[in-house]
């Protein structure tokens, strides 16, 4: 028999008092069925510190404090105008079967579409929620396309809860050094599987940004930009990505004598031709478009890769169709489909995006997407795409400017001598001027802040002190220096150096701690009540893991490690939840208390013991105010527009 998950309410008062209050009737959740029952609430002002007797709680009706009827979705039934429009779409299904649009959502004609269905039609998040069948918390199954009436099975979208922050993954470029990044993700995933067996590490991140090799690793060109496409868009496992990376690197980067490399460079402007890499990427990605229904769009993840226009222009190629970008972003352009595509038939293919961002000068020729432009390696603009991904956070989290965690992974760096310990430089040898020029240009490209991911990381940290502990950087010092971008023989050495470095480095454990704590988030259950001296609220701490064996094991392992929540400095253990069946019931802990005002910051931490080491990390989006949480939930928005986001027109 399944027991209710919660039989204790945590009451937190702004005078520093925390009390675990036994309810008259255990509540599986706060809903309209139990909201009229009387629960006990301890008034902190009635505590007598000089009396050891237990203070008698006073009873207050919970009809206004704890009704979930106000909280769940804030959705309203469709209006007559909306129903009439959907009926018109259904009657025009023959035309819509061959007509697809990418610049507006056909169901509402108000917003840009973000989520593609297997038939090729795209809808915005609001209408996916409206047209889909809700099968779980923030989870919707779409069984039919409104436009063409095509029917589907297993087309499910899981959206991020409104009050939950986002996790960002940024992957540097670096040719074959991209194997370092994959090895890092593999080791981090192994640590994660202790708590969440079988969960792909890439599924933890809401925004994935890559450049150069971070995206093609599985396509045969080993650069760091293609990982974002292979791991997230294609849903490839890290283990398979490592194997494909190694095999295809050796296939594409065929060893050539010096004279052959020089001849190819002079004859066609690159050491390698387009055919080898193009065919490898086509086989890997097929005809998949950035707009297709993929493992990434199924969990509402945003993927982007950076590319450099030729002769100029900075661009990102993404799967989110410009949603989240506004006119303030003047330093780069977003490209999703062919700008002259009126019929919606020319969305950019995944392999084209991978090929564009991997076109490293000298190594591969530039790549032209018909009707869009000619592009080269994104590392020429952003070898470390951290700031590009970070610029999207406010729009994706309704104004909250900081992610829960921003994980930036490098592809190795050379150890530099500390200031004051420089070795004397030998005098410059007399060389042929052209050769000397090429040598200096090569050295400049490798030591430039744009192409040196580690330098750019330090630059961001110096200018974004607000990011602080949320920004994690993982990289490996290379004892033998940088291998060339196409040196496939260096892959085993790079993997060994990465494994040895991260085995003893605390950085991976710190990243894991932040990820684990960010599974938990807070939302208000009813509208807070303003009193003369304070504001009382009713909320709950939730976990963004679906009920099942995975959730049950996750909570069990945290309990074993003595996990507890710190709410404004006061603690409540996970054991206070009592007996709970995580295979069938969502995790939640109701929290009631008082704060000085709606704008008062509320801090919630998850604390636990890991191998004798105490860990304390903020839950998702903490610290926050009640006003921020209410705004994210849409309390003060017109109900029919609560989920609608303003987007850039055009």
Predicted features and spans:
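Long C-terminal appendages of very large multidomain proteins
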Residues: 20-26, 604
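Conserved catalytic cores and adjacent C-terminal regulatory segments
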Residues: 2-5, 14, 29-35, 41-43, ...
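Short linear proline/tyrosine/threonine-rich motifs used for host-factor recruitment
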Residues: 9-11, 18-21
């Amino acid at each position: 028999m399944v027991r209710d998950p919660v039989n204790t309410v945590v009451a937190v008062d702004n005078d520093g008092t925390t009390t675990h209050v036994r309810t008259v009737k255990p509540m599986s959740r706060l809903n309209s069925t139990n909201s009229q029952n009387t629960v006990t609430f301890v008034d902190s002002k009635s505590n007598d510190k000089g009396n050891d007797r237990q203070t008698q709680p006073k009873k207050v009706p919970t009809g206004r404090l704890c009704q979930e009827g106000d909280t769940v979705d804030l959705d309203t039934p469709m209006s007559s105008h909306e129903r009439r429009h959907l009926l018109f779409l259904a009657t025009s299904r023959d035309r819509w079967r061959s007509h697809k649009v990418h610049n507006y959502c056909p169901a509402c004609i108000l917003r840009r579409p973000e989520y593609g269905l297997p038939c090729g039609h795209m809808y915005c998040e609001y209408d996916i929620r409206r047209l889909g069948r809700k099968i779980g918390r923030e989870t919707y199954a779409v069984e039919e396309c409104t436009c063409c009436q095509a029917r589907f099975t297993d087309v499910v979208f899981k959206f991020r809860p409104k009050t939950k922050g986002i996790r960002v993954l940024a992957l540097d470029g670096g040719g074959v050094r991209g194997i370092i990044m994959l090895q890092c993700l593999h080791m981090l995933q192994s640590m994660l599987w202790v708590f969440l067996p079988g969960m792909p590490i890439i599924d933890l991140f809401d925004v994935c940004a890559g450049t150069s090799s971070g995206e093609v690793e599985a396509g045969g060109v080993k650069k760091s930009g293609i990982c974002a496409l292979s791991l997230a868009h294609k849903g490839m496992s890290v283990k398979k990505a490592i194997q494909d990376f190694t095999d295809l690197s050796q296939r594409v980067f065929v060893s050539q004598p010096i004279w052959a490399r020089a001849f190819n460079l002079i004859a066609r402007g690159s050491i390698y031709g387009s055919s080898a890499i193009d065919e490898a990427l086509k086989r890997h990605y097929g005809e998949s478009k950035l707009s297709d229904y993929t493992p990434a769009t199924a969990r509402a993840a945003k993927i982007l890769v950076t590319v450099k226009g030729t002769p100029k222009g900075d661009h990102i190629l993404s799967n989110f169709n410009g949603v989240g970008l506004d006119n303030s972003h003047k330093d780069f352009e977003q490209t999703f489909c062919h700008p002259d595509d009126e019929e919606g038939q020319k969305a950019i293919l995944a392999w084209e995006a991978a090929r564009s961002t991997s076109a490293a000068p000298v190594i591969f020729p530039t790549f032209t997407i018909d009707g869009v432009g000619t592009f080269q390696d994104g590392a020429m603009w952003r070898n470390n795409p951290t700031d590009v991904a970070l610029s999207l956070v406010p729009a994706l989290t309704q104004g909250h400017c900081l992610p829960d965690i921003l994980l930036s992974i490098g592809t190795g760096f050379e150890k530099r001598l500390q200031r004051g310990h420089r070795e004397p430089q030998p005098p410059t040898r007399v060389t042929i001027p052209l050769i000397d020029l090429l040598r200096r240009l090569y050295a400049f490209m490798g030591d430039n802040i744009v192409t040196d991911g580690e330098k750019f990381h330090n630059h961001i940290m110096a200018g974004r002190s607000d990011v602080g502990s949320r920004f994690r950087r993982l990289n490996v010092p290379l004892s033998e220096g940088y291998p060339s971008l196409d040196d496939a023989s260096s892959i085993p050495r790079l993997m060994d150096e990465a494994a040895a470095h991260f085995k003893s480095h605390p950085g991976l454990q710190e990243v894991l701690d932040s990820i684990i704590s960010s599974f938990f988030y807070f939302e208000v259950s009813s509208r807070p009540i303003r009193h003369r001296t304070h504001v009382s609220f009713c909320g709950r701490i939730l976990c963004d893991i679906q009920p099942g064996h995975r959730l049950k094991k996750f909570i069990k392992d945290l309990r074993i490690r003595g996990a507890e929540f710190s709410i404004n400095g006061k603690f409540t253990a996970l054991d206070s939840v009592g007996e709970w069946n995580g295979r069938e019931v969502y995790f939640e802990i109701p929290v009631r208390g008082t704060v000085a005002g709606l704008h008062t910051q509320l801090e919630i931490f998850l604390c636990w013991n890991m191998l004798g080491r105490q860990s304390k990390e903020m839950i998702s989006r903490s610290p926050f105010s009640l006003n921020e949480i209410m705004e994210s939930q849409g309390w003060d928005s017109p109900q029919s527009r609560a989920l609608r986001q303003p987007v850039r027109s055009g």
